[in-house]
Amino acid sequence: MAFASASNGAVRFTEEQEALVLKSWAIMKDDSANIGHRFFLKIFEVAPSARHLFSFLRNSDVPLEKNPNLKKHAMAVFVMTCEAAAQLRKTGRVTVRDTTIKRLGSTHFKNGVSDTHFEVARFALLETIKDGIPASMWSPEMKNAWGEAYEHLVAAIKEGMKPVALL
């Protein structure tokens, strides 16, 4: 999916897209722990092999549904994703609380995250949001708004995944 970026590198996220993201995030926010957990369960349903990307899951016998480390991580990632999306238009760029995009990029690079993984996560995120809001709210425009926001976040993470050239 293509996304718009102004010539100065600022993100263009329309007022309508922002309104859709903010409205749906307001509904999901209070249940973000459970919705975030469902997001990751959907990722592992679509791509079971993605478990190896998470050090806290590699040698764990705890079922995904009950794994406290997964629940904690899933909530943090879901909240970060939604908050970054909600601020996209206001800030004109991807902003992330408690960490930096460069660190996220470095972690994703170190763990071998690929374009395919980002696509699986995009699919899982959109399905999770669709299930996390009233059916009457879900629309092609809502899907597009969240998809656009996700693509901006991924682009920022991928920028941080580039190896630093040594001079």
From Swiss-Prot:
Q: Which cofactor does it need?
A: heme b
Coiled-coil positions are none
Textual note on the cofactor = Binds 1 heme group per subunit.
List this protein's GO terms for biological process: cellular response to calcium ion starvation; response to abscisic acid; response to cold; response to salt; response to water deprivation
Q: Which UniProt keywords apply?
A: Cytoplasm, Heme, Iron, Metal-binding, Nucleus, Oxidoreductase, Oxygen transport, Transport
Positions contributing to heme b binding: S55, H73, R103, T107, H108
User: Looking at the record's lineage, which domain of life comes first?
Assistant: Eukaryota
Please give the catalytic activity noted in the UniProt record. Answer: Fe(III)-heme b-[protein] + nitric oxide + H2O = Fe(II)-heme b-[protein] + nitrite + 2 H(+)
Q: Where in the cell is it found?
A: Cytoplasm; Nucleus
Inducing stimuli: Accumulates upon salt (NaCL), drought, cold and asbcisic acid (ABA) treatment. Induced in nutrient deficient conditions (e.g. Ca(2+) deprivation), but down-regulated in resupply conditions.
Q: Quote the EC number.
A: 1.7.2.-
Motif residue range(s): Homodimerization = 45-49, 115-127
Q: Which residues form the Globin domain?
A: 12-162
Principal subcellular localisation of the protein: cytoplasm
A cellular component term from Gene Ontology for this protein is:
nucleus
Entries under PROSITE patterns matching the protein: GLOBIN, PLANT_GLOBIN
Annotated site residues (Homodimerization) in this chain: K143
**GO molecular function terms here?**
heme binding; metal ion binding; oxidoreductase activity; oxygen binding; oxygen carrier activity
Describe its partners and assembly state: Homodimer.
This molecule's function is given as: Phytoglobin that reduces nitrite to nitric oxide under anoxic conditions (e.g. during flooding or in waterlogged soil). May not function as an oxygen storage or transport protein. Has an unusually high affinity for O(2) through an hexacoordinate heme iron because of a very low dissociation constant.
The entry sums up its family as follows:
Belongs to the plant globin family.
Q: Which protein are we looking at?
A: Anaerobic nitrite reductase NSHB4
Protein's organism: Oryza sativa subsp. indica (Rice)
Gene, per the UniProt record: NSHB4
